[in-house]
Amino acid sequence: MSIFKRLLCLTLLWIAALESEADPLIVEITNGKIRGKDNGLYYSYESIPNAEHPTGALRFEAPQPYSHHWTDVFNATQSPVECMQWNQFINENNKLMGDEDCLTVSIYKPKKPNRSSFPVVVLLHGGAFMFGSGSIYGHDSIMREGTLLVVKISFGLGPLGFASTGDRHLPGNYGLKDQRLALQWIKKNIAHFGGMPDNIVLIGHSAGGASAHLQLLHEDFKHLAKGAISVSGNALDPWVIQQGGRRRAFELGRIVGCGHTNVSAELKDCLKSKPASDIVSAVRSFLVFSYVPFSAFGPVVEPSDAPDAFLTEDPRAVIKSGKFAQVPWAVTYTTEDGGYNAAQLLERNKLTGESWIDLLNDRWFDWAPYLLFYRDAKKTIKDMDDLSFDLRQQYLADRRFSVESYWNVQRMFTDVLFKNSVPSAIDLHRKYGKSPVYSFVYDNPTDSGVGQLLSNRTDVHFGTVHGDDFFLIFNTAAYRTGIRPDEEVISKKFIGMLEDFALNDKGTLTFGECNFQNNVNSKEYQVLRISRNACKNEEYARFP
């Protein structure tokens, strides 16, 4: 090569390096360069692949790290693709949406010229392990505060993410394995985007909260994040760890045309050959009515010989073993969390005007095990009927199911599906763990939220329903409209809570002027109650 050509090459490389250094939208990682987008208040880098495409031969397999190298600059200005799902909130008969090839991370960094690095909040979205995506959770409120870098991840949902035959051939939990691989990617790469790899907090809502708890049950989670917050969902909720997965997997096979095989390896091979849309659309065949059960496919306990197993023991057994990450954890609920799922019972039939709740009077023993997730936990029909009878007597006594008795039904759903697990989780963690365990209850009804959306009614007061707190952190127009001045204040305090949790090395947690009290080494339950204009530490000998 001539001297002239060498000088020309060096000059071009030097110019390219200067351009990259001068352009804050260009980030370079092992796979190559990434170009983001300037959104005014913040920079975004969306739809970055972190895993190989989970399609074809890689469907129903543990995710593999993304290994391709980009020769051109990767365009990270494309809106995130939602994983394929049968979405409860699509008000049409065909609820199919999304793409099977969806394993990406999206990063949002405040524009602060005088600041080069930020603590990191990783979001695990909710959706009952069946639907949802990080893209519906807004980040504008956090970006306006300008103190946190936000990462949203995608993971397999419904049958594509959680179908399981209960053996090593189709063990399940692929969605949880997707999450774990994404967390590893974030730890490795986030510094390139201005994130602090030693100051990462994982937060999730509903199924995302349960996922955060399940991730924490891996000892080496302590190397991936500094702490975790499970909002209105944890691993002990009855809808999280599923039984009956094998039966549903083979039923799925029959629905999509795999015949009546009872051999797991044959079923897996057949399912790999079917269109993803057929597999996901089969969800409708598992619904008893409306979108019940709301989680037809979810996490399972895998066999010990499963390759790349994520969970081989029940979460309670894992906690009792003490072999989980000793990092601070917060577990929360709202006073009327059960408004999710219960509110849909108030939806009127467009033809008859009758509501699902009216039909419960004749169908309670048929539907209750699906509504409250003990269909597969009970061994006999008599066991199911006995529990259904006891629950009705406990919460309604001799009252009929109706709009007038809705609050009794909602309280039942709140207790069984969300609240009862909180003291159980606290008890186990403080007995077998050493790291701080915090809890809060949110008690501040919104003007319009999930209750109104699911019921399609405005004539019923729902209280503080599922998501009324979380949607103040990640503003979500799809699930609520408007935000009051008091909620603006609460939103800022929640965001400050996340920043402090990520930055401090003492494992403490604060909300505005209130300091959370640690449940470890405490005989009483320590719960912070957050209401419209106040926060207050409450202490219970028995959980209320």
From Swiss-Prot:
The protein's name: Esterase P
Gene encoding the protein: Est-P
EC annotation from Swiss-Prot or TrEMBL: 3.1.1.1
Signal sequence bounds: 1-19
GO molecular function terms noted in the UniProt entry: carboxylesterase activity; serine hydrolase activity
Record Gene3D superfamilies: alpha/beta hydrolase
Keyword Signal: yes
Pfam families linked: COesterase (PF00135)
Record-linked PROSITE patterns: CARBOXYLESTERASE_B_1, CARBOXYLESTERASE_B_2
Reaction(s) catalysed by this chain's protein: a carboxylic ester + H2O = an alcohol + a carboxylate + H(+)
Annotated glycan sites: 75, 114, 262, 456
GO cellular component: extracellular region
Cysteines paired by S-S bonds: 83-102, 258-270, 514-535
Active site, renumbered: 206, 466
